[in-house]
Amino acid sequence: MPVDKNLRDLEPGIHTDLEGRLTYGGYLRLDQLLSAQQPLSEPAHHDEMLFIIQHQTSELWLKLLAHELRAAIVHLQRDEVWQCRKVLARSKQVLRQLTEQWSVLETLTPSEYMGFRDVLGPSSGFQSLQYRYIEFLLGNKNPQMLQVFAYDPHGQARLREALEAPSLYEEFLRYLARFGHAIPQHYQARDWTAAHVADDSLRPVFERIYENTDRYWREYALCEDLVDVETQFQLWRFRHMRTVMRVIGFKRGTGGSSGVGFLQQALALTFFPELFDVRTSVGVDGRPPQGAPDAAQG
């Protein structure tokens, strides 16, 4: 190996006869992917490329997140706990990636952004179909959001499908009911288009699980997986809001919203409220929760 020349030779087995064969760029369709960054500013503002790539990569991660959450729902429907936990673990890491990449956009200063903001017109991240779709999968359902996508019948139909189907949390509650937990009957069939709100009738179910983790370890582990997902999602929302505040202050959003104020409202929205509420009541009657199971059970 000619290390003294600061290079490495191609190994004999490396494929170089690639004419007409599947290549890295062909498999990933890089010609299409890397030609999709088309700044609208004239002359092209240097920082518009950052803005475009930030949002395009976010949409790719959102596509993967939606893919994993749909799989989690199917696994719950089939009572496949460990498979569900696997995809929820991946979902959490995707959300972490989405959260951390705000640090790249934070390098965009207010003066730099104002150099090309006008070309965005009324376009806004608020119009991200995939983001709304994921919110619906997780249970933050709002039929009003369909109005935003009236210009896109296909996308609107996809969003409506998620609106009218049980969310991840609702499928989790149905899973608990199948395994003997006292889930109210209306969770078997209700108006799935309505957002889930905190329900005191569910608290005893989760108190029982959290105070008897040795007996209900699978249910308990799923609860904590869902808490992880919501926590990371809220961190993403918070980081989004702070990044917007850093870049535009309290200006109105390009999509017509109040901007930071509207994003702050999202931080009050929850997916799995009972899983957080139960933490207040666990063990308050003086009975210590049961410990975790031994290794054979886990």
Curated annotation (Swiss-Prot):
GO molecular function: heme binding; metal ion binding; tryptophan 2,3-dioxygenase activity
Metabolic or biological pathway: Amino-acid degradation; L-tryptophan degradation via kynurenine pathway; L-kynurenine from L-tryptophan: step 1/2
One Pfam family from the record: Trp_dioxygenase
GO terms for biological process, alphabetical: L-tryptophan catabolic process to acetyl-CoA; L-tryptophan catabolic process to kynurenine
UniProt keyword Nucleotide-binding present: no
Domain of life: Bacteria
Broad class of enzyme this protein falls into: oxidoreductase
Cofactor note: Binds 1 heme group per subunit.
Residues given in the record as substrate binding sites: F51, I52, I53, Q54, H55, Y113, R117, T254
Cofactor(s) the protein requires to work: heme
Subunit structure, as described in the record: Homotetramer.
Database matches in PANTHER family: TRYPTOPHAN 2,3-DIOXYGENASE
Family under the similarity heading: Belongs to the tryptophan 2,3-dioxygenase family.
HAMAP family linked: T23O
Protein known as: Tryptophan 2,3-dioxygenase
Organism field: Xanthomonas euvesicatoria pv. vesicatoria (strain 85-10)
